[in-house]
């Protein structure tokens, strides 16, 4: 049975390798788009009722939703600064949405102090965890244009191959092939993440024109 197969993948050793892995995941998620239909094609070419349960439908939809988070946040950020009145208020709302998961986790850690742990070490541990979470949010914000770009690219490639060309659906660059490449330099990062620079410059220009 396929459920008895174990697949092992080494954890990426740099950001670009992680991006390549997540791009593969996004393509795999969107290639399952036909499984959201009420009737699906079987191996012999005929169509039959979709055997997936409601929970399986929910998992598929949640994977698709996850790949659209970065593009949606980037669009909301642009509209917040350019397309709505009182942008400071809406920027605060967007920041609250972004920070709310971390705030809830920090509050949970702060309130659930083990009985045998003293207050000062507990506060230090909570502070270290909060700093790590907030640093992660800052990094995610800094690379948001790149995250949105590679997500949309993976989705577009999959939809093209799935609905139009119907070719190269199994064309992948595996993690082993990707990790065997030379260690990325600063120039490689700039080349791969040009969307960050372009997005920042565009936002500054548009903000100056519409402010």
Region roles according to the model:
Residues 179-195:
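Membrane-helix boundary/juxtamembrane motif in polytopic membrane proteins
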Residues 79-85, 200-211:
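Transmembrane helix-loop junctions at the membrane interface of multipass transporters and ion channels
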Residues 1-147, 161, 165-176, 187-189:
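Non-transmembrane catalytic domains and loops of membrane-associated enzymes and transporters
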Residues 152:
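Catalytic cores of secreted or luminal carbohydrate-active enzymes
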Residues 70-71, 195-200:
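Core segments of transmembrane alpha-helices
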